[in-house]
UniProtKB/Swiss-Prot annotation:
GO MF term list: heme binding; iron ion binding; monooxygenase activity; oxidoreductase activity, acting on paired donors, with incorporation or reduction of molecular oxygen
Cofactor: heme
InterPro entries recorded: Cyt_P450, Cyt_P450_E_grp-IV, Cyt_P450_sf, Cytochrome_P450_monoxygenase
UniProt KW keywords: Glycoprotein, Heme, Iron, Membrane, Metal-binding, Monooxygenase, Oxidoreductase, Transmembrane, Transmembrane helix
Organism superkingdom: Eukaryota
EC number(s) per entry: 1.-.-.-
Gene Ontology terms: cellular component: membrane
Glycosylation positions in this chain: N279, N419
Function field: Cytochrome P450 monooxygenase; part of the gene cluster that mediates the biosynthesis of paraherquamide, a fungal indole alkaloid that belongs to a family of natural products containing a characteristic bicyclo[2.2.2]diazaoctane core. The first steps in the biosynthesis of paraherquamide is the production of the beta-methyl-proline precursor from L-isoleucine. They require oxidation of a terminally hydroxylated L-isoleucine to the corresponding aldehyde by enzymes which have still to be identified.
Protein name stated in the entry: Cytochrome P450 monooxygenase phqL
Gene that encodes it: phqL
Lineage: Eukaryota, Fungi, Dikarya, Ascomycota, Pezizomycotina
């Protein structure tokens, strides 16, 4: 067998050297360059990426058939395969060389500084996130090295200028959502809609679901969930409790009740729902690979690799189906508003069903995670760095005639602690992708070309001395009695701005305030023996929502005043 194999190799070498083969390779190489310039440079190819190999295979099959069956001297299967391989190699080489040359030397973003490999491919920033779980610190380092405008990808900029938030995210901005939001296509949630008109239409039932009166209807669910959490704390008084674990159970349970009137009973049974494990692993993977949006297309289409994604979507479908079967006694939940709008549209299509499932997924996984990160962050600061604020909050609570969502919104120190936690412990550290309008965008006098993907790294922005004095210190007074420490109020918008702002803000804040107050007024809260707050801080990870290490606290009962 070996001599026969060597004979084939010896035959191949002169074939490569022949003028005919060189001409064929050159033609394919030039065709690859032309394909990049004429086709692949136009529009977005991210969500269509999985179809490109299919198209290439079809072309290869046509070429193979041509060489095998075209009239003329007979061509062996081996020779036909060799010729098709030559053309394919030349075409791919031409396309690749053209793409890399264009990005490295001729691209419209070449005037922006940044690591040279970032010009060539999003694999560079992907590798940063893969190697550094706290990639938000790495991005901050890039800005310290290169300045306010950093090229982090072939068509992507990271912008940390104080004016950037208003220019990119405000209501007057012409920026739209970028290709990142299409990665779960054809499942399109409200969060993923890139067309502003469609987003405005789909947003209406959400606005009804989160208006003040509707939010108050969710209060019984919040109280029930809080009581279940308090029961678990009561059983473990004086013992170590991992509040990262317990608060995540609490918010997941709460999301089930508020969104679908479903009972997951994670807190009650001290057990994580299986879907939480899948969501956690997906969150970590998403933080790494989502920078290469086209790769998500391949993952979605590949059996085995798409198992987690299918499980998350399947769970969301199950919640929708279960909720549709339920008969509620006038009690509203978030899904009831979405379902009502779905029926009123009167046009049930395959896409509208997918969108409904996507919206369900948005409520379940985005809502519970961000609230949990905020509550846990508050507990971290109140026990690890600034326990004196616990006393201040209790003193302010003691002055209230009653505790309810309205009075808690006025408790100065509590709300200052929440704001400062959102600044230093923001759930979405790396920000949200936007795309500049076709005519481009000016930020601080710097022109950014049209159709450029742009991200504002909130972690870096919130630690910028141009925006906040003593930015790395936890100082809640900057939101109350020392407002001079907030140098640029317009640089702080944790719930975003404009048409894409967070509709669930009032519900999220009600949840955070309620559970914190019930814990603070009932218990003395301290770090558990052996707890390592520095390890907690050091092990934060970047993802769709920030990943957190265990936060071990101990609770001992205290006397409550007046309630």
């Amino acid at each position: 067998m070996e001599p026969h194999h060597d004979g084939h190799i010896l035959k191949v070498l002169p074939m490569l050297a022949s003028n005919e083969n060189f001409s064929r390779l050159t033609t394919a190489f030039v065709a690859g360059i032309a394909a990049h310039i004429i086709i692949f440079r136009r529009g977005e190819w991210d969500i269509a990426a999985a179809r490109i190999p299919v198209g290439l295979f079809i072309l290869q099959s046509c070429l193979f058939s041509y060489y095998l069956f075209v009239p003329g001297p007979p061509t062996s299967i081996y020779t036909a395969l060799w010729l098709v391989g030559q053309i394919t190699l030349g075409f791919i080489a031409g396309t690749t060389v053209s793409i890399l040359s264009y990005r490295a030397f001729f691209h419209r973003l070449n005037s922006f500084p940044g690591p040279f490999p970032a010009r060539l491919s999003m694999w560079y920033v992907t590798s940063l996130y893969a190697q550094n779980p706290d990639a938000f610190n790495t991005v901050r380092g890039l800005h310290q090295q290169y300045g306010d405008f950093v090229r982090t990808g072939p068509t992507e900029l990271s912008v940390n200028h104080p004016d950037a938030l208003q220019a990119v995210h405000s209501g007057r901005s012409e920026c739209t959502k970028g290709p990142w939001y299409s990665m779960l296509h054809p499942f399109i949630s409200l969060f993923a809609i890139r067309d502003k008109a469609e987003h405005s239409r789909r947003r209406k039932p959400w606005e009804l679901a989160f208006r003040p009166n509707a939010v108050l209807e969710y209060l019984p669910a919040l109280e029930k969930g809080t009581n279940e959490l308090l029961e678990q704390v009561e059983r473990r008084k004086g013992k170590s409790m991992d509040m990262t674990y317990w608060i995540n159970l609490f918010t997941f349970d709460l999301t089930g009740r508020v969104a679908f009137s479903q009972e997951y009973e994670c807190v009650k049974h001290n057990k994580r729902h299986p879907i939480m494990e899948i969501n956690d692993s997906s969150n970590l993977v998403t933080g790494v690979v989502s920078h290469v949006v086209w790769l998500i297309s391949f993952i979605k289409a590949t059996p085995g690799l798409n198992a987690n994604m299918k499980a998350l979507i399947g769970f969301s479908e199950e919640q929708v189906q279960n909720r549709q079967k339920m008969q509620t006694s006038g009690q509203r939940d978030v899904f009831s508003w979405l379902w009502e709008d779905f029926k009123e549209q009167g046009m049930e299509t395959p896409q509208s069903k997918l969108d409904l499932v996507a919206d369900a997924s948005l409520v379940i996984f985005a809502g519970s995670g961000t609230v949990a990160v905020t509550i846990i962050g508050c507990l971290y600061f109140l026990t690890s760095t600034s326990p004196d604020y616990l006393t201040q909050i209790r003193q302010e609570l003691d002055t209230l005639d009653e505790i309810n969502s309205h009075t808690l919104s006025k408790v100065q120190t509590l709300n200052a602690v929440i704001n400062e936690t959102l600044r230093l412990h923001y759930p979405a550290l790396s920000g949200f992708q936007r795309q500049t309008p076709p005519g481009g965008l000016h930020i601080a006098g710097r022109y950014i070309p049209g159709n450029t993907n742009i991200k504002i790294p909130f972690y870096t922005l919130f630690l910028d001395e141009r925006n906040f004095a003593e930015p790395e210190k936890f100082i809640p007074e900057r939101w109350t009695t020392r407002k001079e420490l907030v140098k640029n109020p317009e640089a702080f918008a944790p719930f975003l701005l404009g048409p894409y702002n967070c509709l669930g803000k009032s519900l999220a804040l009600m949840q955070v305030r309620h559970v914190l107050v019930e814990l603070i007024r009932r218990y003395e809260i301290v770090l558990a023996p052996g707890a390592d707050p520095e390890k907690y801080w050091r092990e934060r990870t970047d993802g769709f929502v920030m990943g957190l290490a265990p936060l071990d606290l101990a609770f001992t009962e205290r006397e409550m005043a007046g309630f």
